[in-house]
Regions:
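Catalytic cores of carbohydrate-active enzymes across secretory and cytosolic contexts
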Residues: 2-875
Length: 875
């Protein structure tokens, strides 16, 4: 069990003394850390150690590696901790070493240049002097030295921060400081996932207290039932941006409240609710305490959505009514949803939510029923849905791939019940990964040698990356083989430790790891590393174990399968998948051919995505929102073999990997799983293996290298975080900033007007209906005009409150009706019966059989999206 018996509220001090085991070593060992004095010539090492720029600036990071490579690994690649542990003699030696001093000065130059030189603006109407984007997320994965992340959401948030920094975007991030972070994982001899925790000492983390201009540490507070919880604010420097982290583990609080920010995704539903109050409400207050006034607020997944209520409360305190406040707040808010799985959306039961949020009702000037309405949804069953709150409290919403955008539009269609799902306001921005973080050093060095340093400034130019094909196959293959060998060596060290701890004999260890010795003949290495959730179907390969065994045991075409990943401690089916793979790996026919690696983390992930040959992804369609691990693999020339879901639905081009079309139709999940498993094995047997082992006289397969180059060439300029953040800036941030300013100016005149208009429209809309004013002709000649008159029973609304539109549709080859044109009708006054009159005079642009549909919907110039009210009437 993964309990919430958090040890975070102990004093932040050195580890406890340990009792020596065994009669031959008597007494107690008391920890004592003797910290070195950093020589004056290296004084700024301390500054470099607390700027997470080191997480993506390789020369800065390598400076610490070269200081003491062994200690670097022992300290978990944590520069701040390393500087406390490094030997005085080594520091003194480095201070006299001309080569080290040269690298030190280079690192300082890179650091200072990064912070002082601004790149040419591509921010598209965002003014760094007046605009600020505040990005809220429950987790951030910037580097393993700050473990406040669990997986894809956190890594994506970290990459977003890094790209925002690289682009000099006016940007600040807000999260929670988890002392325990996410759980650590070991796998025992029976394949059981063993959950552990590793509380971090604050002194080890790259964080500093956030202070005001006079140097006083910043504190804010939030109200919980019967008490006030104090929060300390920590600041993380990540290049040009700051990340503010809230911490409840301070002496002013009770033990229970100190544990609120202890563990990421730990504890029960009440703990989760407390965390989200701290993140959303406390996060807004933290930014105010820091003197920051964001103009755009980005809610990354539903966890921080309570910030909407806090910002509304601020405006209500300034004299606005709640509806007006909500319009202004929503106008400046962007919401990104990340999961198509219902279980991924936080829902709090009515009693719990009411108990914790009742004090905010009075502050907002509404009753509890109105507040609950903001979080209502079909799946909440009377509870409060944080995704629903985020959707209703924002005006710009998106999924994280084209397919996921469509899925999210369907899932969240209840917000706009009368709007066809394909037209509702949910869009998409496909995720991207931070190239400087995940591109292997060997590839960076090769690009520097072949292309010069300019390639770093060409990350969004597709034509530039055509030059990948100019790299000789021999050079290209040599880099990949070097990365593969390093990956296999790292994996071998990990699994040998794992096996020895589990009591595996040395003879069996040798047999289990014999394929981790690369040679010219192979093996082909297939990697599967991600969260072990059931919808990701880690066991898809094992539907036909006899056929799989035949593939893996061909001596002429050796194959190695590497699996890694964690299952949430409460996800028992996910843990069963881990056991399943472990059991298969110990069968005689799979011995040494399937390896399950424990302790999946960022370091292992970087090794795998740069070193395997094939990246396998087998989600149940359409439940893979994005799948950024495949993007990380592709930019390193690793070939994807994946279900066409998430990003791969856009990334697959036929020449850059393999895609499995989801098997749809009237089949159950079990049948679909069997069919897709068979197709996966077909592709491996008939395409992947023959191509990879087509070595001919070169010692490597030229056709394989062509696919690998295409994978890199196509992924690099499209699926990177720089493109992603620029897209958010163009399509979301600048619109939110402009819209919020428009509604807030002149003492919120626009917000008041829009709120009043929406109330009037909502009251009148049930009585709105359309009827014909003339007969619709059944045929026309090309060049003739179609004349229509539509009469609208407007129920008190005026002609400028409505848009009336005619849709021209025709069928495609599948029989689906496709909208070919949308034409607005012109207002023509009021008839004798008080009906609004609208006219159409339109010449169809194409001949052939078509159908027409006419609809009306509310219109106001201040709407962010024409369908945001969710109202529509059809003829």
């Amino acid at each position: 069990m993964w309990h919430n018996s958090c040890k975070c509220n102990q004093k932040d001090a050195s580890p406890k003394p340990t009792i020596a085991k065994g009669h031959h070593v008597p007494g107690t060992r008391y920890p004592l850390e003797v910290q070195p004095n950093i020589p004056e010539r290296l004084a700024r090492l301390s500054e470099l150690a607390v700027d997470l720029l080191y997480s993506w600036n390789r020369p800065i990071r390598l400076l610490f590696v070269r200081l003491d490579p062994v200690l670097w690994e022992r300290c978990g690649r944590n520069p701040k901790l390393m500087l406390r542990r490094v030997g005085q003699e080594r520091l003194d030696e480095a201070a006299q070493d001309p080569l080290f001093l040269e690298e030190y000065q280079r690192a300082l130059s890179l650091h200072d240049t990064y912070h002082t030189v601004r790149i040419p603006s591509r921010l598209m109407d965002l003014d760094p002097k007046t605009d600020l984007v505040a990005y809220f997320c429950a987790e951030f994965g910037l580097h393993e030295s700050l473990q406040i992340y669990s997986g894809g959401l956190g890594i994506l948030a970290g990459d977003h921060c890094k790209a925002a920094s690289d682009l000099s975007l006016p940007f600040v991030a807000v999260g929670l400081l988890y002392r325990q972070g996410y759980f650590t994982q070991t796998i025992d001899a029976q394949g059981n996932q063993i959950v552990g925790t590793a509380p971090a000492l604050l002194a080890d983390l790259p964080v500093t207290p956030a202070c005001d201009d006079e140097g006083r540490e910043l504190r804010v507070s939030v109200t919980l039932p019967g008490r006030t919880v104090a929060l300390k604010i920590w600041r993380v420097i990540a290049g040009r941006i700051s990340l503010y982290l809230l911490d409840s583990d301070i002496p002013e609080n009770t033990a229970a409240d100190r544990a609120i920010t202890c563990q990421l995704y730990g504890g029960d539903r009440e703990t989760r609710l407390r965390q989200e109050i701290v993140l959303g409400i406390g996060g807004v207050r933290a930014l105010r305490a820091a003197g920051l006034q964001p103009t755009v607020w980005h809610i990354n997944e539903g966890h921080p959505a309570f910030q909407i209520l806090e910002r509304c409360r601020e405006l209500v305190n300034q004299g606005l009514d709640f509806d007006t406040a909500l319009e202004i707040v929503a106008a400046g808010t962007v919401f990104t949803t990340h999961t198509p799985v219902p279980a991924g959306h936080d829902i709090f039961d009515e009693e719990l939510f009411g108990r914790y949020l009742e004090s905010y009702v009075t502050d907002l000037g509404i009753d509890i029923a109105e507040l609950k309405t903001l979080g209502s949804s079909p799946i909440s069953q009377g509870g409060f849905n944080m995704t629903a709150l985020a959707l209703r409290g924002s005006r710009l919403h998106n999924g994280v791939s084209r397919i996921h955008g469509e899925v999210a539009s369907r899932m969240e269609a209840y917000i706009w019940p009368q709007i066809p799902w394909a037209e509702n306001p949910v869009g998409y921005v496909t995720n991207g990964i931070h190239v400087a973080t995940f591109l292997a050093q060997e590839w960076s060095s090769l690009f520097d040698m072949r292309f010069g340093s300019e390639w770093r400034n060409k990350l969004t130019e597709a034509s530039y990356w055509e030059r990948i094909d100019t790299i000789s196959d021999h050079s290209y293959w040599s880099v990949h083989q070097s990365l593969k060998a390093a990956m296999l060596e790292a994996v071998k060290k990990r699994v040998i430790r794992q096996y020895r701890r589990n009591g595996v004999g040395e003879g069996l260890i040798h047999r289990l790891t014999r394929q981790l010795e690369p040679d010219a003949k192979g093996p082909l290495v297939i990697g599967f590393a991600r969260r072990f959730a059931t919808y990701k179907r880690a066991g898809l390969l094992f539907e036909d174990p006899i056929r799989l065994a035949r593939l893996l045991n061909d001596p002429e075409r050796p194959v190695l399968l590497l699996f890694a990943g964690k299952a949430h401690p409460h996800d028992h089916p996910g843990q069963n998948l881990i056991r399943l793979i472990h059991e298969f790996s110990r069968r005689p026919e799979f011995e040494g051919k399937i390896i399950l690696i424990e302790g999946y983390d960022l370091s292992l992930a970087r090794r795998l995505v740069t070193g395997v040959d094939v990246w396998l992804n087998t989600p149940e369609y359409p439940l893979e929102a994005s799948g950024t691990s495949g993007q990380k693999a592709a930019i390193n020339g690793v070939v994807n073999l994946s279900i066409l879901d998430g990003w791969w639905g856009e990334g697959y081009a036929g020449d850059n990997g393999w895609g499995i079309c989801p098997h749809k139709g009237l089949i159950d999940n079990a049948q679909r799983t069997r069919e897709e498993s068979a197709e996966l094995l077909d592709i491996l047997e008939q395409q992947v293996l023959p191509l990879y082992f087509d070595a001919a006289e070169h010692g490597y397969s030229r056709p394989w290298i062509a696919i690998s180059k295409a994978a890199m060439r196509r992924a690099m300029p499209v699926f990177n975080a720089e493109r992603m953040v620029l897209e958010y800036t163009r399509d979301y941030y600048r619109k939110a900033a402009r819209h919020a300013r428009l509604l807030a100016q002149k003492e919120a005149a626009g917000g008041r007007t829009l709120a009043q208009w929406k109330r009037a429209v909502a009251a009148a809309w049930p009585g709105v209906r359309l009827e014909h004013g003339n007969d619709t002709p059944e045929s026309l000649k090309v060049g003739e005009s179609l004349h229509l008159t539509i009469l609208v029973h407007a129920n008190g609304l005026h002609e400028n409150d409505l848009a009336v539109e005619c849709l021209f549709e025709s069928q495609d080859e599948t029989g689906e009706h496709i909208v070919r044109a949308q034409v607005q009708l012109a207002a023509g006054g009021v008839d004798s019966e008080g009906r609004l009159v609208f006219h159409l005079d339109h010449k169809p642009g194409t001949s052939g059989f078509q159908t027409l549909r006419v609809r009306a919907y509310p219109y106001h110039a201040l709407l962010a999206h024409r369908f945001e009210m969710g109202c529509m009437a059809w003829l």
